[in-house]
């Protein structure tokens, strides 16, 4: 009898990556060393802060803007908005980061934005500095609309940094060797800016879907900063791919990057782009 052909084996389904807003272990790993985080992380362009303040909440700007900072961390952006004359309340899921921010004068309530209870409070602006990817994008946009006053502004922003290839490639290679099982190990040495711009465009889509905002705008601020070897090695452990490494893994990565910077003379110039998606809440409740 002729043999029946067997169906070809099907490849095992690949696990889908966990959305970042559900990756709570990573989201709450930044508080491991809040002092280093606050010391090393770059501030936001003054022009960005000024533009948000000037554009909130629209035709009836009060003397002092009430700003809600979602995922405020150690209060880097919040302090900049306070210096611009705003009253700022932080919401932060990591109690260690919240305590650091409180010690520097920022009132902070510990919760995820989705679970946070506004208790009837409303704001002229809701900002999220380098934090919106840890928030459910649909629930976050809906909640922002609920707590914003009519004509208030939602502003989601963050940095994209592009180290020179002489620094980025040794980092990526060392990371793959040190942490081959990490979900971050497969990322390219340098991700194109367009990748991040596409992410901010998706944020705009989620904002549109609420039907409670005017059409979102995309803002861009380009700038540069020079880093010494010590300054960059201070910042690297505060980034998401490194906050959960074991000490020996982290040491291996930092050693390779330090050697690469030494080969450049101990200093390099980082190109930054700060991207923002922002939208004004409609006047209708």
Positions of predicted regions on the chain:
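Conserved Class I S-adenosyl-L-methionine
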Residues: 3, 194-285
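Conserved catalytic/acceptor-binding region of the Class I
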Residues: 146-222
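Short catalytic micro-motifs in class I SAM-dependent methyltransferases
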Residues: 130
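Nucleotide donor/acceptor-binding cores
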Residues: 64-65, 121
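A short, conserved alpha-helix within the catalytic core of class I
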Residues: 135-144
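Class I SAM-dependent methyltransferase SAM/SAH-binding core
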Residues: 66-70, 74-116
């Amino acid at each position: 009898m002729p043999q029946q052909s067997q169906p070809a084996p099907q490849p095992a389904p690949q696990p889908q990556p966990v959305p970042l807003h559900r990756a709570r272990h990573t989201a709450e790993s930044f508080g491991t060393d809040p002092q280093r985080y606050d010391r090393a992380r770059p501030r936001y362009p003054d022009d960005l802060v000024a533009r948000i303040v000037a554009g909130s909440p629209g035709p009836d700007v009060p003397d002092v803007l009430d700003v809600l900072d979602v995922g405020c961390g150690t209060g880097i952006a919040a302090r900049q908005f306070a210096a611009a004359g705003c009253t700022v309340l932080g919401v932060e899921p990591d109690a260690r980061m919240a305590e650091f921010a409180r010690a520097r004068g920022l009132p902070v309530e510990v919760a995820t934005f989705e679970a946070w209870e506004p208790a009837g409070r409303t704001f002229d602006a809701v900002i999220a500095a380098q934090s919106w990817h840890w928030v459910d994008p649909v629930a976050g946009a809906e909640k922002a609309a609920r707590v914003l006053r009519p004509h208030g502004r939602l502003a989601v922003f963050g940095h994209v940094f592009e180290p020179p290839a002489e620094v980025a490639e040794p980092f990526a290679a060392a990371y793959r060797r040190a942490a081959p099982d990490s979900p971050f190990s497969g990322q390219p040495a340098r991700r194109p800016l367009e990748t991040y711009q596409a992410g901010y465009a998706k944020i705009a889509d989620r904002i549109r879907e609420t039907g409670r905002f005017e059409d979102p705008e995309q803002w861009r601020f380009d700038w540069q900063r020079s880093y010494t070897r010590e300054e960059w090695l201070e910042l690297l452990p505060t980034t998401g791919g490194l906050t959960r490494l074991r000490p020996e893994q982290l040491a291996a990565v930092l050693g390779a990057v330090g050697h690469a910077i030494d080969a450049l003379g101990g200093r390099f110039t980082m190109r930054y782009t700060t991207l923002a998606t922002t939208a004004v809440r409609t006047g209708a409740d």
